[in-house]
């Protein structure tokens, strides 16, 4: 059993965030519960709930997600999870110019407020080891948060991060990192990058994909060179669409067992 507590944040970027704090019943066996901060909670939290994974009994979860139609959520994600332009402001998404992008600094503040609300609701969480997890665009946001290191995050988990987004922007941001932290990269063995978005490709689908695993290995090497405890977890047989479920469960395992 568990407790699911709704938390209210002021809207950011012109849209609200649906925030839930999930607490397992009972007291932790040893020390404070680890806290896993889930992005895209509209998809990731149900995946964990339905899994019945035993790690749910030893980990608190802070879920930040969206409500609405999928097309609407896609636009929200493009705004919230992407780095700002050279002037620090908003700009357009490179693959879908109709999408506004560059709202990651505002999303950083949303995560900060959500963590403060969660710790106010459950004071013991003030002593928790906090992990931040995101997939795809949300994985890009996790790396942006790592580059800023302005959140009280101890452990960063990025699944299939959108490293291609305005390449080499995120690589540049990751060149000057601060204190060493744990970073876990999760990637599907069969993933590929396509120059067209799924929406732009239309019913015929996308072709001529470029394998992304070598890029994930490059990311691991760059982070390790800066003293990060960077690990790469390859999910066998998984393409981009299948990574979300596998990676989210793996993220729970890593967050709940991280020292």
Ranges and model annotations:
Residues 144-155:
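Conserved hydrolase catalytic core segment
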Residues 247-259:
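Catalytic active-site module of serine/aspartate enzymes centered on a nucleophile-bearing elbow/loop
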Residues 17, 30-121:
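Serine-hydrolase catalytic machinery in alpha/beta-hydrolase-like enzymes
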Residues 158-240, 255:
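The feature captures the conserved acid-bearing segment of alpha/beta-hydrolase catalytic domains
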Residues 134-138, 142:
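Gly/Ala-rich beta-loop-alpha elbow adjacent to hydrolase catalytic centers
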Residues 1-34:
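A domain-start/cap signature at the N-terminus of enzymes
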Residues 132-134, 159:
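Short beta-strand immediately N-terminal to the catalytic nucleophile in serine-hydrolase-like folds
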């Amino acid at each position: 059993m568990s407790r699911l507590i709704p938390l209210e944040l002021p809207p950011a970027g012109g849209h609200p965030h649906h925030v839930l704090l999930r607490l397992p019943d009972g007291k932790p066996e040893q020390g404070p519960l680890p806290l896993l901060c889930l992005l895209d909670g509209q998809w990731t939290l149900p995946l964990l709930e339905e899994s019945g994974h035993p790690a749910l009994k030893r980990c608190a979860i802070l879920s930040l997600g969206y409500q609405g139609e999928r097309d609407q959520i896609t636009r929200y994600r493009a705004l919230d999870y992407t780095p700002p332009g050279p002037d620090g402001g908003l700009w357009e998404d490179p693959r879908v110019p109709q999408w506004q992008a560059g709202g990651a600094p505002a999303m950083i503040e949303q995560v900060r407020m959500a963590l403060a609300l969660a710790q106010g609701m459950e004071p013991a969480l003030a002593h928790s080891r906090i992990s931040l997890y995101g997939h795809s665009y949300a994985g890009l946001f996790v790396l942006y948060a790592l580059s800023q290191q302005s959140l009280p995050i101890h452990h960063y988990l990025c699944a299939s991060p959108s490293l291609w987004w305005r390449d080499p922007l995120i690589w540049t941001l990751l060149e000057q990192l601060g204190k060493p932290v744990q970073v876990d990269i999760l990637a599907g063995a069969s993933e590929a990058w396509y120059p067209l978005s799924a929406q732009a490709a239309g019913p015929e689908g996308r072709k001529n994909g470029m394998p992304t695993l070598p890029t994930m290995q490059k990311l691991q090497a760059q982070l390790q060179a800066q003293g990060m405890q960077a690990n790469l977890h390859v999910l066998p047989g998984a393409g981009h669409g299948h990574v979300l479920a596998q990676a989210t469960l793996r993220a729970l395992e890593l967050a709940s067992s991280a020292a």
